[in-house]
Amino acid sequence: MNIHEYQGKEILRKYNVPVPRGIPAFSVAEALKAAEELGGPVWVVKAQIHAGGRGKGGGVKVAKSIDDVKTYATNILGMQLVTHQTGPEGKKVNRLLIEEGADIKKELYVSLVVDRVSQKIALMASSEGGMDIEEVAAHTPEKIHTLIIEPSTGLTDADADDIARKIGVPDASVAQARQALQGLYKAFYDTDASLAEINPLILTGEGKVIALDAKFNFDSNALFRHPEIVAYRDLDEEDANEIEASKFDLAYISLDGNIGCLVNGAGLAMATMDTIKLFGGEPANFLDVGGGATTEKVTEAFKLMLKNPNVEAILVNIFGGIMRCDVIAEGVISASKAVNLTVPLVVRMKGTNEDLGKKMLADSGLPIIAADTMEEAAQKVVAAAAGKK
């Protein structure tokens, strides 16, 4: 789950990480009121969407008068903001952050992620803040410093000070940087975040350390114990189909292809998508129905896939372990009839009650294309989708 910058800064503030004074605004009138409350002489008008690159896309403006605030708020609110992370369709801006200006002397970068290799927390920091860390990694990787943190120990004073000095924090500001780094770490750990990023973390002309931006991603599997994080959820920023899928306990992610995929198990779903691509096809979605799929669940899964007008064929790939193949067959038959399926459907089933499931499909009278192996299923669905063009 992602949250907005201003929400991330609320979290940082709770952990004593210095952030600029700022007020969220949902209208031009609220933006003007916020600017007046903050006082001048400089304000920053920032679009709030779940994507990076807002500045380059025209979503961050420095205002030097109240009239500027009004102009920028009017232009940004409601705009379809396109960045390198949104795709060409962009995202509509429904809220702003009006923030006091900052005296930027130096921009730094710091982030925390879960490192799957070490199974610990990795802190990454760089003297090259204010730009995409991917660019730094590609062109000047030596400027990225990584520290693997043992969760039982946490981020020690010595390690925090060492990282601060490595990224160019002067001695007079190291104590402030330590406070910011340890606060970020504590926020990351306490909230079950999967990513916490400050870009940039700035040094001001007076030597102050301030988090000028904040990005958090949270582990959705841990949200049950963080109602305060769930309260930050902005459904306008999420895919409508993914929201609908969550109501039926379906793991669904929209993609750009034309072949719908219905699979049980995330690993098999990924392998299915890879195999489709291997034979020249493009998946239209990731869809894991899990181990407890019912007829209703399968029907809803079909409905979700077919809401995408680009879907020209569907592949159902099921391994019957916990999930019985005859139950899936019943769901596929019922779903095909319920949605009046008109696109080609390829079904591959292996495992528990496989023969019964296959017989049910064969006796259904529906034009279902059977496949025995994953490679055969992928080839058939790619060919079927090509035949629809």
From Swiss-Prot:
The keyword Glycosyltransferase does not apply. Its EC number is 6.2.1.5. It is an enzyme of class 6 (ligase). GO terms for biological process: succinyl-CoA metabolic process; tricarboxylic acid cycle. Substrate binds at residues 264, 321-323. It catalyses: succinate + ATP + CoA = succinyl-CoA + ADP + phosphate; GTP + succinate + CoA = succinyl-CoA + GDP + phosphate. InterPro entries: ATP-grasp (IPR011761), ATP-grasp_succ-CoA_synth-type (IPR013650), ATP_grasp_subdomain_1 (IPR013815), Succ-CoA_synthase_bsu_CS (IPR017866), SUCC_ACL_C (IPR005811), Succ_CoA_ligase-like_bsu (IPR005809), Succinyl-CoA_synth-like (IPR016102). ATP binds at residues 46, 53-55, 99, 102, 107. Keywords: ATP-binding, Ligase, Magnesium, Metal-binding, Nucleotide-binding, Tricarboxylic acid cycle. Mg(2+) binds at residues 199, 213. The keyword Oxidoreductase does not apply. GO terms for molecular function: ATP binding; magnesium ion binding; succinate-CoA ligase (ADP-forming) activity; succinate-CoA ligase (GDP-forming) activity. Binds 1 Mg(2+) ion per subunit. Pathway: Carbohydrate metabolism; tricarboxylic acid cycle; succinate from succinyl-CoA (ligase route): step 1/1. GO terms for cellular component: cytosol; succinate-CoA ligase complex. Residues 9-244 form the ATP-grasp domain. It comes from the Bacteria. Gene3D superfamilies: ATP-grasp fold, A domain, ATP-grasp fold, B domain, Succinyl-CoA synthetase domains. Its cofactor is Mg(2+). It holds the Pfam family ATP-grasp_2. Heterotetramer of two alpha and two beta subunits. Succinyl-CoA synthetase functions in the citric acid cycle (TCA), coupling the hydrolysis of succinyl-CoA to the synthesis of either ATP or GTP and thus represents the only step of substrate-level phosphorylation in the TCA. The beta subunit provides nucleotide specificity of the enzyme and binds the substrate succinate, while the binding sites for coenzyme A and phosphate are found in the alpha subunit. NCBIfam families: PRK00696.1, sucCoAbeta. HAMAP family: Succ_CoA_beta (MF_00558). Belongs to the succinate/malate CoA ligase beta subunit family. This is Succinate--CoA ligase [ADP-forming] subunit beta. It comes from Cupriavidus pinatubonensis (strain JMP 134 / LMG 1197) (Cupriavidus necator (strain JMP 134)). The lineage of its organism: Bacteria, Pseudomonadati, Pseudomonadota, Betaproteobacteria, Burkholderiales. The gene is sucC.
